[in-house]
Amino acid sequence: MRWLREHKDEAEQRQWDIMNHNASAAVKMIERVATLPAERRMVRLGSEMLQGYTEPSWIAWWQRPEIQDHCEKIFAPIGEAARKYGVRLSFHPGQFCVLASEADEIVERSILEFEYHADMARWMGYGKTWHDNGFKINVHLSGKGGAAKFLRTLGRLSPEARNLITIENDEMTNGLDTTLAVAQHVALVLDLHHHWINSGEYISAQDD
């Protein structure tokens, strides 16, 4: 995103244009998905809805009160539409969101990234209760720190983030057994493909 570092006034105007466009497009997408059968009414929203939200050079801009107020104004209709039509929403932060990393600096950046997604969910009206209306922010339990490090990091997240987080088994470092170790603390998502790659075991829909 080189344009974020060029011509500050132009970049800020582009930020306004992009955030407004993305929020409006999300509402239209939900309205389209609302025409599908109930079991298919789900949308995974993209992490890039707000450009550079966690970039060090842009954090102060995004945290300005007028920007935060505007984000809440334009994101609220997304949640309203989803609840009106029974569309389940989710986020899936990228591979660099490693809440169980052994490196403290990576954990700090990962918390910042996860809370960015929690901010968007909060503006949409989610996070007040445990996975309200099926909303989830799903991340892999990746990182060499495993379950113990993840649980320490979990306690540092905002209440809304803890209400919405789900953990998915990873294909490389932390498989199904590791995710089950945190099942008393957080909701789990089972990725059948990742489990097959990690263990060689295939789980079918008919298995007990």
Predicted regions and their residues:
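Acidic/histidine-rich catalytic cores of soluble enzymes
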Residues: L141-G143, A147-D208
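Active-site groove signature of glycoside hydrolases
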Residues: P93-Q95, L99, M124-G143
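Histidine-centered catalytic micro-motifs
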Residues: L89-C97, L190-H193
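Alpha/beta catalytic barrel-like cores
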Residues: M1-R88, C97-I111, D119, M124-K128, ...
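Structured loop/turn residues at beta-strand edges in well-structured enzyme cores
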Residues: A38, D132, Q184
